[in-house]
Amino acid sequence: AGGIFLALGVPNLSISGMTLSIAVVVPFLNMTKQFCGQIGQISQQINAVVMGLAGADRIFELIDEKPEADEGYVTLVNAQVNPDTWQLEEADHHTGMWAWKHPHRATGEIEYVPLRGDLVMDNVDFGYTPDHEVLHGVSVFAKPGQKVAFVGATGAGKTTITNLISRFYDIADGKIRYDGINVNKIRKADLRRSLGVVLQDVNLFTGTVMDNIRYGNLDATDEECIAAAKLAGADDFITRLPDGYDTMLTGNGAQLSQGQRQLISIARAAVADPPAMILDEATSSIDTRTEAIVQAGMDKLMEGRTTFVIAHRLSTVRNSDAIICLDHGRIIERGNHDELIAKRGYYYQLYTGAFELE
């Protein structure tokens, strides 16, 4: 401000009859500027404190959250075949064979049921709130090794069904059986351990690429992680990274493309070697070339596994054993691709572009 007065050749300033020299005005303006700056900084600090308190409330709310209720008593164990009786029994080491350890409370007998990935949903009703039901009489049957696809508009209930399979929510009515066992009897951690999940929104953690793949199975060796990456089609781009599998990932893998992040997620599921897979829109947000790479890896991963697929691109579900069409929580059509095309109904309209999934 004083520079402006000097440039204009104004040696003094008159305010309300008082004459002030530049020597007085300039320091006053500078001090006012500094004072206002400090006030601005204080307001910013207050905003930071308020945001911190709000975050602290959420943190303490999470800390105080009660543990998830779990009444399950059927557990997943390593199994082996007894050479004398040819019956399954529990093993104290990794055998590559899994079984459900099912104690029968009435008799005290322990039954070992092979983990196969056989799933039955029988007339299931569900609502996120008691007064708003989102699934109505849903029945789904998946034999071991089958690929079952769910299609429908956003909000039809596709993801809700997969959440019920994982028991993130409990059903209001009906039955869900996994390998013939009511899922309510299976311990939740063991149930989820038997399921491989690949989501559209990938979460990568700060650490190496190898560590992020190993999250699927913390006991996996480096060789097993690399084999899983090759199966997923991720090995090619990983080996081109600056440090290969030892490349550090930060910021949820910000240095990788969406397709590359998804390939790592698929490798993470592959290293767990689950008998059942849930693919929730796994290839709906990547380019066509990357989708082809991902799909090739997924086809290998799905061999011999029960797979539930939710995709917005019908090309990814065309080879499914069963396609289930949902509308407002109800199954309106089911069958394979050729059967549904022949019906010329809802799926036919989707496939020919008459309807949109979004």
Place the predicted regions along the sequence by residue.
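Helix-loop-helix
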Residues: 1-57, 62-63, 88-97, 101
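Conserved E/DxxT/N motif and adjacent residues on the DHp alpha2 helix
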Residues: 61, 68, 214
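Proline-centered turn/helix-capping motifs that create local helix->coil transitions or kinks
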Residues: 64-71, 236-240
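Solvent-exposed, non-transmembrane helices and loops of integral membrane proteins
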Residues: 68-80
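ABC-type nucleotide-binding domain
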Residues: 79-358
